Structure formats: C-alpha cells, structure tokens
Amino acid sequence: MQIVEKSGEGLSRVFGVTVPASELATRLEARIAEVAPQMNVKGFRPGKVPTAHVRRLYGKALMGEVIEQALNETTTKVLEDNKLRPAGQPELNPSSDMDKVIAGGEDLSFDLAVEVMPEFEPIDPTSIELVKPVYKVSDEEVQEALDELAKQARTYEPRTGKSLKAKDGDQLLIDFVGTIDGVEFAGGKAEGAELVLGSGQFIPGFEDQLVGAKPGDDVVVKVKFPEEYQAKDLAGKDAEFATKVQEVRAPVDGKADDELAKRLGLSDLAALTELLKSNLAGRYDNSSRFKLKRALLDVLDTKHDFPLPPRMVDAEFAGIWQQVEADKARGGLPPEDAEKTEDQLKDEYKKIAERRVRLGLVLAEIGRKNDVVVTDQELTDAIMREARQYGAQAQQVFDMYRQRADLQAALRAPIYEDKVVDLIFGKAKIEEKEVSKDELLEEDDLPEGYGG
C-alpha cells in the first residue's frame, strides 16, 4: 500500500492512495478461505466447497467486500498516521477502473480528501464575565394566576329572577337544525348543545343573534359560512339555523380556596399557591438562562477567530436555507426578510451558518479539554422522552432510535452542548442583575438560529 500527501492547503488535505492488485488478491484468497467452510452449495457436502468454486460463484461479491475493507482501513491509517482530526466524513474519489480492479487486473487507486478540525486555543472559562438578568415572582402575579384558575373553574347555573334573557358570557343549552336553501346539510344538526355566547365557538354571527334570547324561545339564526371554511361544500354559502333555546345559564366564577385546590389534586390553597409560584419562577428561570446563554455565545463568538471547515459551513447553510425556502413557500418569512433579495438573504444566513459552526467547534473543544461526555443513561433518557411523545408507537420509536446512530447523534448534540454551557457557567464570573418582567421576557433582535 502506498500513501502520498498530494496537497495540504488550509484545512483541506488530499492523499493519493494505491493498493496493489496483488495485495487485493491476497486479501481475496484469505476471505474465500474464511467463508468456504461455512457455505452450503448444491452438489457438495457442507463445508467442503472447493475454494475455486467459491471464487467462481462469489468472487466479485467477495472482492467488493475486500475493497470496502481496504478503503476503511486506509482511511483510518491516514488519519491516525498523520494525527488528523477530521471535521467530517472523508471523501474517497477512485481514479482506477473499478471493473478492472474487481476483476483483479488493476491496482486500486484513489484520492482521499479530508477537511480537518482547525487548531485553536479556546477561551479560559474562568476569564469570562457575564451578567444574568433575573426577575423575582411577585405576590400580585401569583394572585393573578390563582384568579385565572378560579375563572377557568367557573360553573354555569340557570338564570333566575326577573330577567332570563341571555347575555354575553352566558351558556345556552340549545337544539338546532341548519339548512341551506331549505335543505338540511350534514353536520348541521344537534340537540343539547352547550354554547357560551362570545366564545367564538360557532361560525361568526351565530352567537350574536342569541343574545337576549330566553328559555323556550325559537330563534332563526341567519349566517354565512366563511369563504375559508374547512368544509368546502359549505364555504361561502348562506345558511339558516332553526334554534330552540332550552336553558340560559349565568356564569358563576369559582373561588381560589381549598376546595379549588382539592379539585386540582392538591391538599389546600397554600399548596396550590406554592405550586403556581414555583411554576412562574421556573418560567422566569428558563428565560434568564436563555438570555445568559445567548450572552455567553456572543462572548465565545467574538473571542474566537479561526478558519472554518468549508464543507461544515456549506452543510449548515444548506439546512438553514432549506428552512428559509420552506418558509418562503408558505408565506412565513418575517416581514423584514420578505423585502430582501435572495442574494441578501443568502449572505445573512451564510453568516448565521458560520456562527453556528464556529460556536459548535468552540463548545466541542472546551468540552473535550474538560472531559465532558454524554453518558449512556443520559442518551437513553432522551430517547425515552422522545419516544413517549408518540403514544402507542413509543416502543417502535424507541427501538428505531436504538438502531440508528444518526438519530442518536441528533439527540446527543444538544445534551452535550448544555453540559458544556453548564460547565462554563460554573467557572465564569456571573453577576446577577434584577430586571423587570418585560425586560426579561422581551425577545432578542437576532435572527432565529443566531445563537448557535
């Protein structure tokens, strides 16, 4: 086997490799000798098939295996002998006539092209200074959350007294039959339907015409189905609903008390209050961490300047641009992007791709230097969380993830990133700064994905 470095510019390396036909022939004979005893061929006793017969029947297939093994071994040897850390899968470009190589009449020659990881010294996490925005949950917010829960737990009771007329916010018990040009249509009939006036539950205009109705009233509701109505045969058509009002019920707000807490599975109001406070604090903690991480990534981005592997950037950009094209096709581009030319968008998103790759390499190097790893248990837990989202298919999804390295890698990456980020947070100098809720929750101006 002969290996020669043909070029080495920037992060790109190209090696010329030649595996003599004689070496491939020797490997083929060894492979035939290995499989012959295991073969059952008609006309021969098990394990007694002559190697010449095996070569005649399966020589091409076995030579294919030999060549594939030679390519893999050569790639490993080139990387190890030259102490290269590949930034991606090396490219193999054969220069031989592969039919002749398989037939044993030509050496296997190919170029092995590889992009290597850039060499750089990452920033010392202990030198990083960050400001963490924090916001403490107020008693007023907790009370608002309690009041909202009580509101959601409202009940409805039949109206009594002098006025039984339905008001906005009341719940009506109704029967109705819908017709178009005097003919009933599918799905337009119901008995004992509960409808809260003003909820927007029915098509526009329906609920408004029932305001003021009393129990026992017959109301002909005239409406027009929206042009974009999901049932295409009804879209844009005029309809009438013969509606019988059975009951008019007034809303009765629930109370934030021990009874409400027990209905929600808690011991008392104090436990419910503490749970709501904890949930709110968790939400604000997540926002605080997000902004702190964004600030950290900004520091890492500005403090590092090194050449990026072009193919890594191209692959990252391709993924981003595919999403941009999909957003554009469904009219989902942000207004500021919709005004830009394709060249302007590509330039912006190319910078985003470069930032992502740079940050990924920096975090990976900091993690490598600090022996950060994703444990098998952490990966298994992530797979289980993913699988549980698929309900009855959870086991099939779990098994699929277990069998596919690419899916595991997609789950492992964010876990690894968060572990490295947490490591940096543990070493950096972080000053907490109290901010308002609006300041904490306001979105950053950076384009989506700029955070890495």
Curated annotation (Swiss-Prot):
Domain notes from UniProt: Consists of 3 domains; the N-terminus binds the ribosome, the middle domain has PPIase activity, while the C-terminus has intrinsic chaperone activity on its own.
Spans traversing the lipid bilayer: none
Protein name: Trigger factor
Location relative to the cell: Cytoplasm
Catalysed transformations (reactions): [protein]-peptidylproline (omega=180) = [protein]-peptidylproline (omega=0)
Record-level GO BP terms: 'de novo' cotranslational protein folding; cell division; chaperone-mediated protein folding; protein transport; protein unfolding
GO cellular component: cytoplasm
Keyword annotations: Cell cycle, Cell division, Chaperone, Cytoplasm, Isomerase, Rotamase
EC number: 5.2.1.8
A Pfam family: FKBP_C
